[in-house]
Every structure is written in structure tokens, then in C-alpha cells.
């Protein structure tokens, strides 16, 4: 992880951590990088989109100023899911894609994600290079372009339809007579998800689809599925689908209001693909956070689980290295490599409903054979500086090491820093529910005591 980039772009509280100055410097640095790497291109184009946060306008303006001053041309495609930016970037043969979003984070935060010309997130090496440019702007700005050589910003919001139509075409047939509740988190999916499911003739109820700039992810979406659960039961819907702020995550709800996490959705999709002969190598990639019960389910169905570090970029790296077509995270990031270059919540939800339709089984029935082992996850708030050095604390590390030795055959312990928020995440799992929960609480209390 670099000085500015985390596991998913640059992120922080808008106007305090992710400032106008930082966005402007990123615009200069990215523009310089693109110019240097495309010396024979007269007109270098990038695609830019955003979620619904009020601070997106501010950051867009700063990024635009930096990029256009370096001669870059920007097509702004408006409010669109993050994977929509990745898709349009590749289709339009742009040199980069930029998404202004803090994903599932609170409305006060914002972030900037960058994709390369193929629609993949930037490598660590390229991010490091851009960070170097951000810290050495004197050299970059020493010879500014002449006034008639600068780039240009234009609205290209009709390009949204290219992405929307692509999603619709990913489904064979339609979803007639399937009753679905969508929770679009007052975010980037508020238009796309509704449009696609209506195109496919689903019977829809849509909630949290009235963004005002400040209500994104507020008690709604994939991180707060409680209301969705109640609405699904109340409307007697077949299922509910919840996205996060930039719609790269999906969490589902069955007809009884039970929440279905990303791992279980991956399990359902993977088995559906295996039965159709499209699960290449019969392998799935998830992360170290995946429940051992999920791993057992895959094994029973002759599917091998490969684990990657947390973060969809690391999942994708392993998928590419091992030639795997489906992977993702418990949190709902799901990558379907035959269809997309990054996690796409709307695409994943379409494929989930397709499995339900084709098997004739409801979501509750499909998920019932995935039995979770007891697992406890506790998030401990820690400021970003202490978060990055938590594992240097001898008292904390000694306690974790001793617990690992004592309970190595009974409990799996995983403690890690969040790549996107000021949190240390403590996860424990095993067969003894009380022991699993107590260990997680003991570790979390110790971290709280030592670091706060």
C-alpha cells in the first residue's frame, strides 16, 4: 500500500483527507503519466464517472483541472456504477478510467479509483509511479502546455446506455413473474439496476433510489440490509438485492428475510456454472475471510477453493494467475471474468436471478446446503496512523500468537487492518460458538486498550 493509494484507490473524508489539492495533484500526475506512456497519441482520452455524493462535484472539478492542463480529454459519463466506468473505458479505447466514489463508506467520505485501458485496476507499480509524480510536481509543471494545447472536458452521459444495454444482453430470456426488491443504497445503481431489471420484465419494488448527495449508504444498501429484509417479507417478494454506494458489491435476501453474503452468492453461481459446464478448471477464488463451511460446501460439489488476500484486486490477481472465471469476497465483491474486469453488483445480481429462474429453486432452497461454521467479526476503530502499525505492538501480537498455539485445532484467528477505513478487523471461526465469540472479543478489547 502506498502513500496515497490504499487497496481500492485513494480514499478519505472529503475536503479533509481527500482534499481538492490532493485531487488536483492526482490530476496533474495521472495526466503526466498518460502523456509519458503515450508519446505518439495526439488526443489522449479518459472516461470519468461518479456516484451520488455531494463532494463528487468538487473532486471532479479538481481532477479535471489537473488532467486538462496536461492535455488530457475527459468524457464524463455521469452517475454510473464503478464497473460501468471500467466497461466503457475498454469499449471506447480510452487510456484510463476514473471513478469518483468511496464505495460502501459513509457519505462524508469519497475516493478516486483508476482503471487502465483494459478496464483493470492499476498495478502497485503504476500507483507508486503516480505517487512519485504527485510528490514532485515542480518538475512536471516546469513547462506548462500552451493555452491552445490543453485538453477538454465534455459530458458524455449517453454512454451510460452502452453499459446498461450490455448488462441486459448478459441474460438469456427474461425475468417475467419474478418479484424482486432492489435496494440501490441511494447510490450509483439507483438508475442502472432499475433500468436493467425492467428491461428484463421483472416485477420490481425499488427502495432507497432517491439520492440527494448526503444519503448514500445511510441505513441502506449492502452494509445495512435490515430494511430490505422487512420489505421483501412484507411484499412477499421472491428475493431482495442490495448494492453498495458504487454498485460493485451485492448482498441478497431470501423470501424469509435472511441475508445472503457474497460467499454464498459465489457458491450458488459457481455450482450453476459447473452444472452448465462453464466453471473453468472447477475452481473459485475467495479470500482468507471466507467461512470454512463455505469451503466444505464447494468441496462436496468437487469445486476447489483458492484463497487470496482481502481486496478484490488481489482476488482478481489470483483469478488471472490460476485461470479462474469466478471469484470475490464475503462482503459482496463478485468478479465474473467472462463478463467483466472488476466486481459488478448489478451483473452478479442478474446472474443470481438467472440461476433461480433456470433451476426452478428459490434462493432459500439454493443457499440451504451452505452451512456456516460459527464466525465472529468485530471492527475496532483505530486512527489511520496506528492502524498501519498495529502489528508492531508486542502485547497484541503475543496474545494472538499464544491464542493461535492454544486453539490451533479449534479456532481460526485472523486479524488485519482495513484497506479502506480506519479499522482493525478481528475475525474468529470454529465449531465452538462461545469460544469463537469470546476470543474475538478478547482480542478486540486488547486492541482497543492498546491503540486507543
From Swiss-Prot:
Q: Which residues of this UniProt protein bind Mg(2+)?
A: 103, 244, 246, 248
Q: Which residues carry this modification: Phosphoserine?
A: 103
Which SUPFAM superfamilies does the UniProt record give? Phosphoglucomutase, C-terminal domain (SSF55957), Phosphoglucomutase, first 3 domains (SSF53738)
Q: Which reaction does it catalyse?
A: alpha-D-glucosamine 1-phosphate = D-glucosamine 6-phosphate
> Which cofactors are required for activity?
Mg(2+)
- Metal-binding listed as a keyword: yes
- Which residues does UniProt call coiled coil? none
Instruction: Give the record's cofactor note, including how many are bound.
Output: Binds 1 Mg(2+) ion per subunit.
The organism's superkingdom is given as: Bacteria
Post-translation: what modifications?
Activated by phosphorylation.
Query: What is any one GO biological process for this UniProt entry?
Result: UDP-N-acetylglucosamine biosynthetic process
EC no.?
A: 5.4.2.10
Write down the NCBIfam families for this protein, in alphabetical order: glmM, PRK10887.1
The UniProt family comment states: Belongs to the phosphohexose mutase family.
Task of the protein: Catalyzes the conversion of glucosamine-6-phosphate to glucosamine-1-phosphate.
Protein name per the record:
Phosphoglucosamine mutase
